[in-house]
């Protein structure tokens, strides 16, 4: 080897060590790291492959979700790599889960584009979930720094303004989803809307998969639905509404549908989670500019949020959607037909509604969070609930929620209007009992029976659904306390 080659080789080796080096030795593991107020923090539940050290697995997650690749590259020397490397700083074993660990990772704020959920998620969940070194991986929680949150608009309207527009205070908002989801003509669809609103509901809504199919194009549905809204408002003297689903194949189509809804006098439009983060943020910006309420159906979330070992906890989706700017999001019922452990659901609701939250491990909240004055995002409870559960719903979910009774309204034997009346009476009698200081939780069934003595539709509903419960064990439960799912 010539002297010149030897010199170049020596200089190169002094500048950086080439080849494949463990991530922990490359600077992605730092147990002494001092967390900055501006850091984005993420907590992963990680099950490493057999033989993989959990610290190395955590460092690999930090590396592959920030600056690293599988081998050392000389272009690291051209960047402020010590700054831009994510730092895994803590690894804890998961209680009652062998060979599974909580991995805490800190990301410098400059790794992310301001106000871009797509960019944030491209790093945090973009690549590492297919990493061979881990058998399973789940994003459990995140802390968003104040400085980052100030680059997001948050909910366009917020709960307080929505209550003022509806003139509804001191109780949950009451609604229903039109059933059947698919197949109705526009005229019959509008009839369902009118009957439900006339019976006492505040809103009705489209379901996630009703868009603009051959049996009913969106214009027809929007026209007949708003006719029902206006008629019911005139008859009842109350402010009414209907969540018109503007979900479509392209942004151009969604804007067109949302504008049509606005032109018809609607105060709210709806989108589905499956349209993607960029589309959600785009629609949220449109909603704020046009002074519209934006409802989000979480369609598709359980494909990655339900299983405890792999995917993403729904509380992270709640945080991202509050940042993105939606006003409503479906967040669970506890007692309904869909997945929902009581403590986990409480954590979701607190994430959406509180301006500041502390660490609460039983609820799955691993980080304290200051929401930088972003408005509240209203949780929606929907799926398999009925008026006989009203005391449980108010106990678990409180007032700041939209209760959606689909089958529990439209399945009433005496018709849609009767179903709506049963739900309205059940809600109001339970709120009155609570406000009077009664033990409405234990006395709930009797409170409902007493109200039903003067409300035939409520009595019919209680007789029909009195034995309907969904007592299945939740798959996503707290790691730090036993929380059996039961409808008591």
Curated annotation (Swiss-Prot):
The keyword Magnesium appears for this protein: yes
Cofactors: Mg(2+)
Entry superkingdom: Eukaryota
Active site residues of this protein: 179 (proton acceptor), 297 (proton acceptor)
Marked site (Transition state stabilizer) residue numbers: 337
GO MF, one annotated term: ribulose-bisphosphate carboxylase activity
One GO cellular component term noted in the UniProt record for this chain: chloroplast
Residues modified as N6-carboxylysine: 205
Free-text remark on how the cofactor is bound: Binds 1 Mg(2+) ion per subunit.
Binding site for substrate: 127, 177, 181, 298, 330, 382
Subunit structure: Heterohexadecamer of 8 large chains and 8 small chains.
NCBIfam families: PRK04208.1
Extra information: The basic functional RuBisCO is composed of a large chain homodimer in a 'head-to-tail' conformation. In form I RuBisCO this homodimer is arranged in a barrel-like tetramer with the small subunits forming a tetrameric 'cap' on each end of the 'barrel'.
Entry's family note: Belongs to the RuBisCO large chain family. Type I subfamily.
Protein name per UniProt: Ribulose bisphosphate carboxylase large chain
Source organism (scientific name): Chrysotila carterae (Marine alga)
